[in-house]
Design a protein with these regions (language model features):
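Residues forming the Rossmann-fold NAD(P)(H) cofactor-binding site
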Residues: 94
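Active-site acidic-Proline motif in GNAT/NAT acetyltransferases
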Residues: 84-86, 90, 118-119
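Conserved catalytic-core motifs of GNAT/GCN5-like acyltransferases
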Residues: 113-118, 124-144
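Conserved GNAT acetyl-CoA-binding A-motif
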Residues: 104-116
C-alpha cells in the first residue's frame, strides 16, 4: 500500500465515483433517487456546495472514494464512501476516512456525521474506531 495516494476531486474520476458506490448500494440496498443524482452529478451535489470528493488511487487505478458534503457552516456529512471489493480490509477505507476528517477540520468543522446501516458491519466498525459515536437508531435500521 506504499503506492496508495489519496487525492482530491478530479473530473477524470467521476465514472469511478459512480461505479464504486453503485456496487455497494445495489448489493445491499435499493438505489434511491438522491443517491443516483449525487453519483451522476458529483460536481453539483458535492463540489459546488462546498464539499470535496477524495479518491484512493493505487498504481493509477481508483480503488476507493469518499465524499465530504458541507451541510451547513461547520457541519459536514461523510457520504458515498466505497472501496473496491477485492481490496477491502487493507486500510484503504481508513486512509480515506482520515483524509476526510482532516479536510473537515481544516475548514473549521464542529460536527462531522454520517448515516450508515448496521448491516454494513465492517464500515460501522471503522467509523467507531475513528471516533464516530452511534447517536440514534432509526426505524429504517440506519444509524447516524
Amino acid at each position: 500500500m506504499d503506492k496508495l495516494k489519496i487525492v482530491p476531486f478530479n473530473t477524470d474520476y467521476i465514472a469511478a465515483f459512480e461505479k464504486l458506490n453503485r456496487e455497494w448500494i445495489e448489493e445491499y440496498f435499493i438505489m434511491e433517487e438522491e443517491d443516483l443524482m449525487t453519483l451522476q452529478n458529483p460536481e453539483s451535489y458535492v463540489m459546488e456546495r462546498g464539499g470535496e470528493i477524495f479518491f484512493a488511487v493505487l498504481d493509477g487505478d481508483v480503488v476507493g472514494t469518499a465524499a465530504m458534503i458541507q451541510k451547513s457552516k461547520g457541519v459536514y456529512e461523510l457520504a458515498k464512501m466505497a472501496v473496491a471489493k477485492n481490496l477491502q480490509g487493507l486500510g484503504i477505507g481508513k486512509k480515506l476516512l482520515e483524509r476526510c476528517i482532516d479536510y473537515s477540520k481544516e475548514r473549521g468543522a464542529t460536527e462531522i456525521f454520517l448515516i450508515t446501516n448496521d448491516s454494513l458491519k465492517p464500515a460501522l466498525s471503522l467509523y467507531l474506531s475513528c471516533g464516530f459515536v452511534l447517536n440514534e437508531q432509526n426505524d429504517d435500521n440506519s444509524s447516524k
